[in-house]
Amino acid sequence: MGNGLIYISLEVIVACLISALAMYYVMKKIYYARGQAVLKSASAKAKLMEFQAKSFVEAEEMRMKSQECKLQQQYENKNLQLKAHFDKKEAYLKHLEAQHKEFVRDEKRYLEKEKQELEKERQILEQEKENFKKQYATCKENQSKALDVMLNYMAYTKEEIKSMILKQLEEELEAQKSALIRRYEKEAKEESKKKSYAILAEATARFAGNYAIENFTNRIALPCSEYIGRVIGKDGKNIEAFKKISGVDIEFSEGDKELCLSSFNIFRREVASETLKILIEDGRIQPNRIEEVYHRVVRNMEKELLSEGQSVVLELELGAMEDELKILLGKMRYRSSFGQNALQHSKEVALLAGLIAEQLGGDKKLARRAGILHDIGKALTQELGRDHVSLGVEVCKRNKEDPVVINAIYAHHGHEEIMSIECASVCAADALSAGRPGARRKSDEEYAKRMQALEEIALGFEGVEKAYAMESGRELRVIVKSNQVRDNQVPIIARKIAKKIEESAQYVGEVGVQVVRESRFKTTATLKQ
């Protein structure tokens, strides 16, 4: 019984051990398989990450190479630009050097010619001196002989005869002296006249400047005739808004492919032309857009005035100059006198004055400076309404310009005597530039003055902000300040302006006065979620 139980227990234990071993083996197989699967998955992920890393590195390398190529291209382009700029500057300097050498050669020839002429004059004077000595010796000898003869045959003392002879000689010498003075005065006048003609001829021959008559119109090309309708706008709103803000007339014919802008004020016309070009190129033409573009163009053109003046100063090699004067030089580009552009005229005067002063032994640089500034007051006449001479003197004194410049401003209109060679050169150059046939047109200047006078009449009334003379003086458009003028005052101002025009106008016709009062209010709405 006991042995049987032991046997059964052993069988159970063996069976349990076998089951446990079998279970262990099975579990080992299962975990091994799972481990292999995890290892394979991890290996695949590692390979994927490695592939992604390689792809990222390759992409970055390609991007860096592309960036490097781009930078290399930019560097090469910049290098080419700098090289082209350097070559241009080098060519310009060589050109200047050649001009300078030619000028030096001309000066040497001129000085050599002058030296030869002086040598001839010296020889002539030496010969005349010798002749005079001989004549004097002969005269003394004849005087002594005559005195001896007279003493022998006349009842006069030696002193009396000597006195008579001296008196006669004195009268003869006085007559000869007068004749010589008249002869030398005539020769000096003829010589100075020839010399002045030669100087002016050489100065004008060495000067070659651009020249163009200023007109009162600008023409704007259109892509097609349909753009005329877009410029006019619905019910004419666009063209009215453009005229109101610019003060410039627009003329066109149906079917035309261009617009004509007309105004006596060059700056106003240039701003309007640039504004219209931008609007046509952009395609969006509406009142708000017109006003926005117009104000932007005005700001940009006012910024360019200083750089324009700086270019003139560098071109003429004038040295340092105050910014206020440079800005006024830039403004002169948009001023005209008798149809002649004020800046172009002043540049001509500066160059000619420099050449003339150089021939006369004056300061070429100072003469150029006085020439470019002699009409500087014309840049302020439209705003301040005074004569350009007093305005030019005032602004030049404020900027501490040389007294020669002040004298040139006064003297070129006869307000002062000419005090220097440089001033005389400026006056002569001004007469040459203005007096050239076709350089000036009197009718254009009279028309511009008539238009400006109409605007000045309106601007003289209190509350008037802007005034534009339009339609060749047949219409005066006046814009008043809304914060100073009430609606019921607008008709009164219009009648007063019309009456003032009637009293002061010196020509026949009618002028329509249109007074505009406009109020604008602007605020900002804040949107919250």
UniProtKB/Swiss-Prot annotation:
Statement: the UniProt record of this protein carries the keyword Nuclease: yes
InterPro entries membership: HD/PDEase_dom (IPR003607), HD_domain (IPR006674), HDIG_dom (IPR006675), KH_dom (IPR004087), KH_dom_type_1 (IPR004088), KH_dom_type_1_sf (IPR036612), Ribonuclease_Y (IPR017705), RNase_Y_N (IPR022711)
Annotated GO MF terms: RNA binding; RNA endonuclease activity
Main location: membrane
One CC-aspect GO term: plasma membrane
Biological processes per GO annotation: mRNA catabolic process
Identification of the protein by name: Ribonuclease Y
The organism of origin for this protein: Helicobacter acinonychis (strain Sheeba)
Gene name of this polypeptide: rny
